[in-house]
């Protein structure tokens, strides 16, 4: 209110001094008290609101998507959906339309990025085209890890989920092996054939729209991978070494932000089942050629067995 008070005072002084016509001074004073409303820039006046995502973490399942999302949330310009939305891969959700999808996103201001993750997107044939039609400008993040390790992690999650629901269990060997050979119908095996899924995505989106994160490197040393993600998303550099610390008890890196420390859910980092060496060797051999095809499509290599 101070600027208004000073303006009225100037008007009154001018009236007394006779510098201006009294009526003009009164009008001037009224303008000072009730100045014209000048619209503010949208970045100031716009309230936070949900909108379609700017970034989608499309997979892979058990590749480190939750860790990637939590690390992205360290950045002040990132607003992330907390749950997996499954908009593009579940018909029951997709039929609700783009407005419903936007309503599942967190509120964000102009200049902030909205992010969602649904790992099942990567291996779903229908998803790429649906994303292109709904949010064609979205950037895509794909985090991958060594295929055999991903398969073992996939099995471990399903095993514990069934255990919690008191459902019958099957050993990995029962699911993975058939008559002494790999069961090529095992879903967890197919999810690790990254080249097949990536080829379909690249038939819809240019490679430049997608950034590949090395999930194994992210576990060992998060910062270098996160700096690459910041650069791809054109975020100002914020994430730094102080945001991470190694938890000796859990055996992986946890997060630190504004003095608060937090680790991923206890379900992360579960011990994998013991697997016979001959089965592991079969898996490594089976994935060798598909991995090379994936490297060629991706235009980058990974340090896998």
Region locations from a protein language model:
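Short glycine/proline-rich turn/loop motifs
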Residues: 47-49, 175-183, 267-278
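PAPS-dependent sulfotransferase catalytic domain
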Residues: 126-129, 133, 137-142, 149-243
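PAPS-dependent sulfotransferase catalytic core
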Residues: 1-7, 12-122, 134-138, 147-171
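A generic "structured core" feature
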Residues: 54-55, 60-61, 66-69, 73, ...
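The conserved 3'-phosphoadenosine-5'-phosphosulfate
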Residues: 199-285, 289-292, 303-305
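Structural motif corresponding to alpha-helix initiation and N-cap regions
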Residues: 95-98, 124-125, 195, 277
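Generic structural signal for small/hydrophobic residues in well-ordered secondary structure
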Residues: 64-65, 101, 115, 131, ...
């Amino acid at each position: 209110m101070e600027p208004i008070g000073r303006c009225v005072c100037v008007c009154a002084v001018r009236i007394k001094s006779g510098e201006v016509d009294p009526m003009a001074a009164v009008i001037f004073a009224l303008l000072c008290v009730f100045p014209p409303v000048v619209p503010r820039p949208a970045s100031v006046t716009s309230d936070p609101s949900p909108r379609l995502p700017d970034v989608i973490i499309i997979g892979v399942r058990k590749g480190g998507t939750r860790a990637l999302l939590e690390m992205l949330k360290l950045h002040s310009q990132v607003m992330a959906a907390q749950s997996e939305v499954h908009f593009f891969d579940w018909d029951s959700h997709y039929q609700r339309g783009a407005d419903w999808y936007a309503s599942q996103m967190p509120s964000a201001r102009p200049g902030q990025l909205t992010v969602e993750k649904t790992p099942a997107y990567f291996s779903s044939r229908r998803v790429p085209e649906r994303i292109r039609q709904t949010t064609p400008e979205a950037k895509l993040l794909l985090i991958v890890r060594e295929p055999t390790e991903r398969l073992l992690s996939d099995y471990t999650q399903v095993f514990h989920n069934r255990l919690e629901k008191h459902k019958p269990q099957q050993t990995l060997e029962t699911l993975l092996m058939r008559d002494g050979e790999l069961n090529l119908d095992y879903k967890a095996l197919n999810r690790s054939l990254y080249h097949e899924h990536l080829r379909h995505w690249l038939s819809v989106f240019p490679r430049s729209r997608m950034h590949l994160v090395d999930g194994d490197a992210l576990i060992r040393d998060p910062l270098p991978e996160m700096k690459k993600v910041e650069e791809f998303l054109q975020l100002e550099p914020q994430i730094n070494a102080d945001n991470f610390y190694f938890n000796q008890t859990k055996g992986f890196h946890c997060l630190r932000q504004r003095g608060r420390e937090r680790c991923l859910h206890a379900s992360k980092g579960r011990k994998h089942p013991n697997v016979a060496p001959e089965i592991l060797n079969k898996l490594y051999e089976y994935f060798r050629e598909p991995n090379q095809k994936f490297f060629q499509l991706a235009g980058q290599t990974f340090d896998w067995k």
